Amino acid sequence: MVEGVRFSGRIEFFDPEAGKGLAVIEIPTEHVATLGGRQQFRVTGTLDGTPFTGSTMARKGGSFCVAVSKAALASAGLGMGDQAEVTLARP
């Protein structure tokens, strides 16, 4: 397992201009290398203490994010625009 990271992030749409679609949380630049670099991979973690699994992905503009399912958001009691305490690790 790769060392995990902890940060606070806002839940937003993958394509904010569209205003709909996939929910993501941007991963701060300083944590990308710890997780294994800018490539797509599965992660496990928590959203405000609630366990979830997701996948990382690059966004246009050069940022890197993790996708969060509707079920994971509902379990954590979170929605679009909410701020969450996030932990991520590669299994």
Residue ranges and their predicted role:
Residues 31, 69-74:
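Short alpha-helix capping/helix-loop boundary micro-motifs
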Residues 1-62, 80-91:
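Long, compositionally biased stretches
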